């Protein structure tokens, strides 16, 4: 059993949109936190059908409920019209809702009622290291951090089913059936570009579609919680920085499956990419769970200097190296960034055995970095 970091009970008195990709553990968390509340699960066909036919049923069933009671609606994006009824019940009966979903895209596209700011927004991420007793870094790098994938020895069949279900659901939702092959190809190309700067034109050529279509495909991945676009950090004066975003899938296991990566040995390029992805994944979750206003960006100059992770307005710069001994050549990007931001905290996360400091750069073993991250000592 994993003890999740997200604490929805701290939002008592407010309604909440709880978003998160499929199988991140949203439903399990809600069952654990609120075992006895009224719950509507729109994944159940009979529940979906009756509310789809008549959304007003929700108001009729809840109009006289005790306002102190919480109501959960799972997969709210399946019937956007229900949000009008939710809005009325919140405004006129002071009922508190948790509205759970795996995709905000349908709601955005149909201009659904997003409750006018009356509901807080929370995101459920895959598991993080602080939630797992006896966390195994190598296992996480290979399996990913979705609960059903991390716990098994070989998650390949579960990953295959996950990607298949996602494609079927999103292709159907987006009416992309005639473009199934191009979208599937796009997901594979996006995996090859994972952690790299996006060049839409090049990806479009590889997929056989237009650059605008590729931008729309990336938007689908973002709005269905399957990926993140991380912008470039450009607030530097001495060196020209690139603004094009990088893309990361929301979980390293997805990339491993799409690229057929397995049994990655430490010291190899593939292990290094997966190592960086997992750590970026943890930082994204940390920022999200702490509702931080600080943005995550990366820095790359036209001359080739790069830092994988910039926190805030240049306050912290973090690089990831999967080697077992960081040397000065591994810190060139950080030292170049220091010329722009002399007060920046400089960090390299690696497979070093012990924490140390080398010319103003803190070298963290990965496990120690993760421990200090979740102890609020990094960001």
PLM features: residue spans?
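Short glycine-rich substrate-engagement loop in P-loop NTPases that contacts/grips substrate
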Residues: 40-70
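Domain-level recognition of nuclease-like catalytic cores that cleave nucleotide substrates
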Residues: 353-379
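Conserved lysine of the Walker
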Residues: 26-27
């Amino acid at each position: 059993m994993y003890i999740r970091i997200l604490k929805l009970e701290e939002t008592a008195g407010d309604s909440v949109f709880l978003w998160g990709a499929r199988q991140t553990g949203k439903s399990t968390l809600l069952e654990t936190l609120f075992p006895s509340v009224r719950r509507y699960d729109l994944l159940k066909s009979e529940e979906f059908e009756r509310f789809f036919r008549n959304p007003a049923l929700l108001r009729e069933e809840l109009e006289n409920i005790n306002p102190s009671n919480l109501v959960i609606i799972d997969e709210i994006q399946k019937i956007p019209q229900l949000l009008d009824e939710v809005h009325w019940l919140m405004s006129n009966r002071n009922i508190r809702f948790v509205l759970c979903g795996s995709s905000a895209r349908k709601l955005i596209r149909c201009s659904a009622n997003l409750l006018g700011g009356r509901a807080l927004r929370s995101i459920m991420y895959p598991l993080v290291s602080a939630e797992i007793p006896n966390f195994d870094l190598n296992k996480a790098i290979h399996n990913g951090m979705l609960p059903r994938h991390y716990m098994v020895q070989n998650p390949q069949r579960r990953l295959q089913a996950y990607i298949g279900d996602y494609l079927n659901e999103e292709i159907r939702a987006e009416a992309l059936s005639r473009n199934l092959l191009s979208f599937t190809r796009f997901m594979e190309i996006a995996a090859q570009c994972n952690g790299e700067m996006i060049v839409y034109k090049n990806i479009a050529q590889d997929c056989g579609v237009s650059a605008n279509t590729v931008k729309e495909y990336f938007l689908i991945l973002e709005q269905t919680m399957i990926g993140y676009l991380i912008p470039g950090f450009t607030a530097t004066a001495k060196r020209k920085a690139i603004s094009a975003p990088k893309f990361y899938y929301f979980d390293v296991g997805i990339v491993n499956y799409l690229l057929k990566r397995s049994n990655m040995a430490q010291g190899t390029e593939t292990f290094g990419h997966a190592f960086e992805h997992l750590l970026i994944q943890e930082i994204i979750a940390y920022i999200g769970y702490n509702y931080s206003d600080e943005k995550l960006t990366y820095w790359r100059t036209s001359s080739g200097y790069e830092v994988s992770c910039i926190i805030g307005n240049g306050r912290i710069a973090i690089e990831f190296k999967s080697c077992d001994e960081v040397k000065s050549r591994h810190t060139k990007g950080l030292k170049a960034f220091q010329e722009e931001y002399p007060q920046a905290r400089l960090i390299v996360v690696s497979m070093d055995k012990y924490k140390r400091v080398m010319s103003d750069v803190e070298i963290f073993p990965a496990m120690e970095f993760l421990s200090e991250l979740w102890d609020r000592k990094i960001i």
